[in-house]
Regions:
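Membrane-interfacial helix-loop-helix modules of multi-pass inner-membrane proteins that assemble, modify
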Residues: 17-33
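Membrane-embedded catalytic cores of phosphoryl/pyrophosphoryl-handling enzymes
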Residues: 29-121
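Interfacial segments of alpha-helical transmembrane regions
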Residues: 1-10
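C-terminal TM-helix exit segments that contain a strictly Trp-centered aromatic cap at the helix terminus
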Residues: 12-21, 83-85
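Short, well-ordered alpha-helical segments in soluble proteins
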Residues: 7, 20-23, 61, 80
Length: 121
C-alpha cells in the first residue's frame, strides 16, 4: 500500500504538472527548482506517504491512545511538509492545497481498492 501510494502519487503528480504547466512563483528563481508549480509534488508525495503509513499502522493497532498518536503524527507531518513549500517560496498556497488533496484522495482510493487478502489487520 505504501509503495503503491507513493509511486502512484508521483506519477499522478507528474501527469498533472505536464497537463497544467503552471509556472512557479517568481521567488523560486532564487532556489534551484525545476518543473511546473501545480500541484506541489512534495505536498502530494508527503501526504501519500504519511497517510499510507498511518493506515498500515492503524490496521495493526487496537490501542485508542496509540491510534490517536499515529493520526496526530500523520497530520503534523503532512502539515509541516505542506507548509514548507510556500515558506521556501517554491509553491503557491493553492499548489500545496491541491497536492495535499490529491495525495489524500489517491491514497484513500488505493486503500479502498487494495486486494482484501493483502490488507493488514
Amino acid at each position: 500500500l505504501v509503495l503503491g501510494a507513493v509511486a502512484g502519487g508521483w506519477m499522478l503528480n507528474g501527469a498533472l504538472k505536464l497537463w497544467i504547466g503552471r509556472p512557479r512563483p517568481s521567488t523560486a528563481a532564487v532556489t534551484e527548482v525545476f518543473g511546473s508549480s501545480f500541484p506541489s509534488g512534495h505536498a502530494m508525495g508527503g501526504t501519500a506517504l504519511w497517510v499510507a503509513l498511518a493506515l498500515v499502522c492503524l490496521a495493526g493497532c487496537r490501542s485508542v491512545p496509540a491510534r490517536r498518536a499515529v493520526l496526530a503524527a500523520a497530520v503534523v507531518l503532512v502539515v509541516l511538509t505542506a507548509l514548507s513549500r510556500p515558506v521556501l517560496g517554491v509553491h503557491y498556497f493553492s499548489d500545496v492545497l491541491a497536492g495535499v488533496a490529491g495525495g489524500l484522495a489517491w491514497t484513500l482510493w488505493l486503500a479502498r481498492i487494495w486486494p482484501p487478502e493483502q490488507k493488514l489487520g
